[in-house]
Amino acid sequence: EMCIRDSCGGVYPLGSDEIATKLSSVRALNEAKEKGQDLVTLCSACHHVIKRVNDDMRNVEDIRTRANNYMQLDEPYAGETNVLHYLEVLRDRVGFDELKKKVVNPLKGRKIGAYYGCLLLRPSTVLAFDDPENPQIIEDFIRAIGAEPVVYPYRNECCGGYISLKEKEMSGRMSCNIVDSAAGAGAEMLITACPLCMYNLNKSGSGKIPVYYFTELLAEALGVKEEALK
């Protein structure tokens, strides 16, 4: 097990000639490769950026060559590392049935809306995370910790993302629509797997229901003491 503290780069650059922004992701990917390990992240934005950069390093020769020329690694990196979101680890490695057996404090009676946003699901051909139109992984997670998932229309819509830095009013409207949609469908709270989404929904949303990170409820369901989280 290895902890990588490098930045993912923050945003996946859309310009085909933009290499420098991708190098921090390549560095993290190469570290995992050298250790012979998968790269697991808790953050949807990091997962999105790193997995797309990894796909570039596997499939786009020009980007791979230029990135390796910049990095000057002992051995060129060519996309060998497997990139996973922690939710994928829970689903595919641990298994939600096994997770359910470990729950000591089932969250019975709680009606929870899953907020996916856009970074976890798209582009689906690269991320291959879940069905981009009708994802189920977070709902399955909610069931595993003993709560009731609430499906609502805006769960896959963008929260405003990085435009919250410049267009606060627009981002606020987008976040409010999401929170209002979930509350209107009967959700008592929202969970997300993206720190930026959590920030936008809490700061710019309507405030009708609270928004939590999925790991907060996981810790509660597993009976993790609050002191252990500090």
Residue ranges and their predicted role:
Residues M2-I4:
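Short, small-residue-biased leader/transition segments that mark boundaries at the very start
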Residues G15-Q37, S171-C176:
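Short, structured active-site "lid" loops
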Residues D38-E61:
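A basic- and aromatic-enriched beta-loop-alpha substructure that forms the phosphate/nucleotide-
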Residues C43, A193-C194, T215:
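Helix N-cap/beta->alpha junction signal
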Residues N69-R93, G207-K230:
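Short, flexible loop segments at boundaries between secondary-structure elements
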Residues V94-I112, G117-L120, T215-K230:
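C-terminal capping/extension of enzyme domains
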Residues L121-E169:
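Redox- and metal-dependent alpha/beta enzyme cores, enriched for Fe-S-associated oxidoreductases
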Residues M170-E188:
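A short, acidic, amphipathic alpha-helical segment used as a generic capping/interface helix at domain edges
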